Amino acid sequence: MRSKRFVLGVPFLLIIAVLLPARAQSGWTVEKTFHIGGDGGWDYVTADPEHHRLFVTRTTHTLVLDSESGRVLGDIPGQKTAHGVAIDPKLGRGFITDGGGTGAIIIFDLNSYATLGRIPTVPDSDGIIFDPKLDRVLAVSGDGGVLMAFKPDIDLTNGKIDQIKLDGAPEFLASDGTGKVYVNLEDKDVVAVVDLTSQKVVARWPVAPGGHPVGMSMDPKSHRLFIGCRNPQKLVVMNTESGKVESSVPIGAGVDATGFHDGQAFASCRDGSLIVAEEKGGQYDVAQTVKTPDGARTMTIDPAARKIYLPTAEFEPVTSGRPKAKPGTFMIVVVNQQ
């Protein structure tokens, strides 16, 4: 076949130069809100992209929602103070941290949502994740000051959970898939690096210029942690190999979770701001601030759908102190990328 040559004129090249950056910087916007209602507070929310589900803790129970419609698919009862959910889709098990009383991890079936067992832990069991490469469920206890680790197929009757002392009050965590776990110590303003093989803390890295570290997420490819800090309010970008703080981004008040997807970092804040940060010239900076309802302090990302889900509610007006949620107004705010 004879080849043909095409010459692009200057006006056409200018159009490309204008359109390509606009596409690369496409923004995020609130798409819709699922009005769920019901009783209970809330904490973390976890996405199951493969099955289009959301798991959201409601203090004494955990809701399972359809992530496309907001329809309630199930309700897992029997918790005292539910905090977070981790799932192992391959095994078909889910895990809920219950920080009430003496503490426990509730294990449930991902298909029927039936409770399979309750493994004793320590009080204030809180953040929880599943690392599929390590085949480990990892959780932390703020009051207990420990990192907990166990296999997802743990014996429901006699199973034991490894506990690693952290010398601090952990809030959330991330795992690199090779045996290193990174834990925010909120009271120490540091990240504790835990080696799961030796079951010891091998490093402590300050998060300054950020304040108390609470939210955490990770990009294993770039070896970076994204740490949401309070007082000062910063999204801190930390190198996981050296502990060096590479960037710090100003964020809103009351951050409680962060996320990372497709080159962008996110911080959800209680003051009704979802911060979107991007890397430019080796430094992260604010690319967009999405206005969300007040109280939307935690989040989860569905990378396939390119959506972010944030639980919150309507609040009673107050003159001072933290406002109380209006009964029956619980909702999930859905933010998507244009």
Question: Where do the PLM segments sit?
Answer:
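Intrinsically disordered, low-complexity segments enriched in polar/charged small residues
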Residues: 7-10, 24
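Bacterial N-terminal signal peptides
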Residues: 9-18
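Predominantly soluble domains enriched in secretory-pathway, periplasmic, or organellar proteins
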Residues: 21-338
